[in-house]
Each structure stands twice: as structure tokens, then as C-alpha cells.
Amino acid sequence: MATLLLLPGDGIGPEVCAQVRRVAAALTPDLKVDEALYGGASYDTHGTPLTDEVREQALASDAVLMGAVGGPKWADAPRHLRPEAGLLNLRKAMDVFANLRPAYCFEALAGASSLKPELVSGLDIMFVRELVGGVYFGQPRGIEDLADGQKKGFDTQVYTTSEIERVGRVAFELARGRTNKVHSAEKSNVMESGLLWKQVITELHAREYPDVQLEHILADNCAMQLVRAPKQFDVIVTDNLFGDILSDAAAMLTGSLGMLPSAALGAPGKPGLYEPIHGSAPDIAGKGLANPLAAILSFEMALRWSLKQTEAADALLAAVKAALDNGARTRDLGGSLTTTQMGDAVLAAL
């Protein structure tokens, strides 16, 4: 029996994960769904955002789905014990190096985008973000006192050939099943790591994926083009920092952060890590206002990529589209449905 580990986390996480549990029970009754504390909720109970037991439970599962993590309540906790540290440590432990962050616009929501509907209608971009390297993990890092009384903050951006190659392969393989086009975004004009990134992707393309169209683009120009003409893109592969920024920018083209899922994948046969890209939204937590669709669509990605239940994934994606076509809207989409009522709409469509 396949196992899904739910880590609801903080803020609105438990509310949106409750809807995932309802959908899983209806769509995949044979799926074993476990649940554990994580993030700030774990810190409050166990003094750490990620216990050894939960880490081992995650590694033994077929897929892990998180709700949300963090909030101002834990802002004064030591950095290594903040909820977000639990997320980084779990990613590292699972070695999920490729972050898939789709930015697609459902036809029913084209009018909710910050851009004109004709620019985003039919939008379907897949970001492939390197997830366990780069400036978020590079050493040395820190804040030092200087002799003149000032302080110096520093981080280190580091990438190796193998780290770039493995995420590049994910992007090229995905492109073969889509429109056969990859953009690689970096800053090779000013960063040595960006120069290496461009070289490695170029060599990998020539050696293993000459059938895929490859274009290199500077990350700042990529940000501009996402606003100017986003439908020129299909698969965008980039590093940890730029992937974080660019995929968030693209998310708003779709109408709401509450709509977008993500997947973090490692080696074949290893569990994937799935989560909505929205935050914990502590200002609306417990009020029934959160949009659960990003979490539900994260479950759809888990069905597709880790649990290998493609038909169930297709049915769930169609149900979400049908619910939106029928006018189901939470507050972030200009409607009035509660979190549970949006879950009801998806279940009715199923």
C-alpha cells in the first residue's frame, strides 16, 4: 500500500491539508495517509521544527505533502530552530534537488491575472529550480563585526558540475513531453557560478538532448519577459535563488498564489516532496478563508510523479478545472467560498 505523509505545518496549512485528506479519501481510498507535526507546530511541542522521527518517516513514505510553514510567532527563535529551517533540512535530507513549479492559468481565471487576459490565457510554464545548492546552502556565510564598528554580511553561491547536470536533465526530459523547448536562466555576465551554469547546460544539451530547443537568457531579462510576453516560455531551468524569485513573479500572472502547487523530486524511486507555494498566511489562519486549490493540486502532482497514479491525477485536475468553470471562487479569486466549500466544489466535480 502506498503511503502519503501529510505535514500540515503552520498558519493555514492544517486547513488546506484537511481538504487534501478529503480528496484523497474520495479519489484514492487505498492510499494510506499519515500525518505528523512539522515547522512551528513541531517547535512548540518538541523544541525543533523537524524531529528525527518525522524525517525518517518522510524518507520511508512514497510522497510527502506539506501545508505551510512559519509565521511571526517564531521570528525570535534561533535561526537553526525556526520553522523554515525545518523545511530546508527536510529538503536536504530527502535530497530533492529539482523543484517543479508550474505557472499555468486556468481559462476561467484569466481575468484575475495582473496582466491582460490575452497575455495569460493558456499560459503553461514549468519552472525547474535547483533546490539544494546555491546561495541558500553555500559556505561560508554569516555576519561579522568589523574593526571600524561596522558589520559585514556574506553568503556564498556555489554550484558543481554534477549539481547543474542533474537538474538540467530533469528540465530537458520534461521538455520532451511538452513543447521541446528549454530556457536556461542565469547571470553568466557577472557571476562565475552563472558562467559555469551556462557552460554545463550547453554541454549537456549538445551531448544528450540535441533534439530539444535550448535558449539561454539572463535572469533579469527573464523577469522582464515574464511580464512582457510570458507565453514565449515553456520550461525554464534555473538555480535556487533565481528560481525562487522568478517562479513567484510568474505565479501572480495566474491570478493567485493560492492556485499554484509545487513538487520537489530527487533520484528515481525516492519520495517526492510536494507543497503549495503560498505561505502560512497567519492573518487569515483559522478563518476558513484560505484557498485549498494549491494544496489539492500539489496532491495531483504527487499522484502523477511519485504515486504513479496518472488516471487519478488527470481526474483531479479535470475536477479542479470543472469547479472553476462552474464559478467556484474563494476570496482571493474574488468570490466568497470558504476553504471547506471550495473542497466541496472539487469533490462534487469528482
From Swiss-Prot:
Site described as Important for catalysis, located at Y136, K187
Q: Which cofactor does it need?
A: Mg(2+); Mn(2+)
**What organism does this protein naturally occur in?**
Caulobacter vibrioides (strain ATCC 19089 / CIP 103742 / CB 15) (Caulobacter crescentus)
Name the Gene Ontology biological process terms: L-leucine biosynthetic process
Keyword Metal-binding found: yes
Q: Which Gene3D superfamilies match?
A: Isopropylmalate Dehydrogenase
UniProt catalytic activity: (2R,3S)-3-isopropylmalate + NAD(+) = 4-methyl-2-oxopentanoate + CO2 + NADH
In its UniProt entry, what is this protein called? Answer: 3-isopropylmalate dehydrogenase
Q: Give the quaternary structure.
A: Homodimer.
Question: A Pfam family in this protein?
Answer: Iso_dh
Q: In which pathway does it act?
A: Amino-acid biosynthesis; L-leucine biosynthesis; L-leucine from 3-methyl-2-oxobutanoate: step 3/4
Task: Specify which residues bind NAD(+) according to the UniProt entry for this protein.
Answer: 71-84, 279-291
A GO cellular component annotation in the UniProt record:
cytosol
Where mainly located?
cytoplasm
What broad class of enzyme is this? Answer: oxidoreductase
Here the disulfide bonds are none
Known EC number(s)? 1.1.1.85
